[in-house]
Structure formats: structure tokens, C-alpha cells
């Protein structure tokens, strides 16, 4: 059973840092491994974190922020392409513990994020090349070619919040069929 919520407690943030290290340093080799087994995002102070919790353990998270500079700019051939989207929020990080990688966790994270981004025009993300089909199913569209970072390649993408709104009822039904009503 999963709970999806905005991260607020220090213990939740500590678990987020450990999950980030496991995924981005250990699995994707984007960052050097650290003896503390923690990875704090450079935009931590301005990030909104939504999390998936199972048995009081953070097993998935999305970190997003709405204040430039956006890291996606470094992955775009023409950063001006972002101007078409109006008010933008960037998903900086998406990490899910490998033992919990399922459509349900991803849908729950994005549904929870949606509750916090309804007033924006678009969501930007740099998605791993291997995960592009999943992002495309979510409604994201490529903004440029893949760009290497560490041992992974990322594709800059965006999704209009109005498109996310159209997908919300389907995600909500899927989650409620498994875990009961969502707030």
C-alpha cells in the first residue's frame, strides 16, 4: 500500500537524499558515489517534493521547482523553445526504488504533483532515453535530441498542464481501484 504526499518532515527529506544517491549516483552514475550515501539536489531549497511512502519508507519522489535557472535549458538546442509554455515548472528529479517501480507508483506521484501544479501552464522534464515511451504515454513531447549526462542520456520534454488534467481521471481511477479514494 502506498501513500502519496508532499514531503515535509526532516526524516522524509533524509530518505529522499538517500534514494537520490542510490538512483543517480549508484544506478545511473550521473554523480560520484558519496561515502554518506546522500545526494542533495542543488536546487533543494527551492524544490517541491512529492513522495510515495510504503511502510513509512520513501520509495519514490519527484522534485520540482518553478524558479529559473531551469536545468533543462542546458539540454536544449534552443532554450527559447520554453517561452511558448508560459508559466513553467520543472521536474528536476524523478526517482523510484527499483523494488517499487510500477505504473501505480509513477501515476500516484504524478497525480500528487498535479495537485500542486494546476496553476502552471506546462511541466518540463529531462527524461532518460530508455524511459521515453513511458513519458510519451504520460503526454510529454520531445523538445530536442538526447543529451548525455554521466552514463545516461536524457531527452528534454514538456507537457502542458491542460493535458495532464485530461489524464487525471484515468490515473485517479487506476489508483483508487488498488488503494481506495485519493484526496
In which residue ranges do the predicted regions lie?
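Acyl-donor binding region in acyl/amide transferases
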Residues: 75-154, 159-161
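C-terminal "cap" of GNAT-fold acetyltransferases
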Residues: 150-178
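Feature marks short, surface-exposed loop/turn motifs that line or immediately flank catalytic pockets
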Residues: 66-68, 131, 163-165
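Short, P/G- and charge-enriched loop/turn segments at secondary-structure junctions
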Residues: 36-40, 77-80
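A short, polar/charged loop-to-alpha-helix boundary motif
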Residues: 31, 67-80
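Short, small/polar residue-rich loop motifs at catalytic or cofactor-binding pockets
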Residues: 44-46
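Conserved beta-strand in the GNAT
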Residues: 51, 56-67, 72, 90
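Short amphipathic alpha-helix that is part of the acyltransferase structural core
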Residues: 1-39, 49-53, 58-59
Amino acid at each position: 500500500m502506498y501513500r502519496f504526499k508532499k514531503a515535509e518532515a526532516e526524516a522524509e527529506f533524509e530518505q529522499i537524499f538517500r534514494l537520490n544517491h542510490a538512483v543517480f549516483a549508484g544506478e545511473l552514475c550521473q554523480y560520484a558515489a558519496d561515502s554518506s550515501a546522500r545526494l542533495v539536489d542543488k536546487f533543494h531549497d527551492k524544490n517541491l517534493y512529492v513522495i510515495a511512502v510504503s511502510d513509512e519508507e520513501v520509495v519514490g519522489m519527484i522534485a520540482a521547482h518553478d524558479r529559473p535557472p531551469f536545468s533543462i535549458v542546458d539540454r536544449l538546442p534552443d532554450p527559447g523553445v520554453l517561452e511558448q509554455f508560459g508559466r513553467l515548472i520543472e521536474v528536476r528529479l524523478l526517482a523510484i526504488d527499483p523494488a517499487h517501480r510500477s505504473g501505480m507508483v509513477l501515476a500516484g506521484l504524478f497525480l500528487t504533483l498535479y495537485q500542486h501544479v494546476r496553476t502552471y501552464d506546462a511541466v518540463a522534464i529531462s527524461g532518460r532515453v530508455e524511459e521515453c515511451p513511458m513519458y510519451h504515454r504520460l503526454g510529454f513531447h520531445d523538445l530536442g535530441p538526447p543529451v548525455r549526462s554521466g552514463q545516461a542520456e536524457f531527452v528534454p520534454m514538456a507537457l502542458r498542464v491542460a493535458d495532464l488534467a485530461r489524464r487525471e481521471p484515468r490515473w485517479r481511477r487506476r489508483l483508487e481501484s488498488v488503494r481506495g479514494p485519493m484526496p
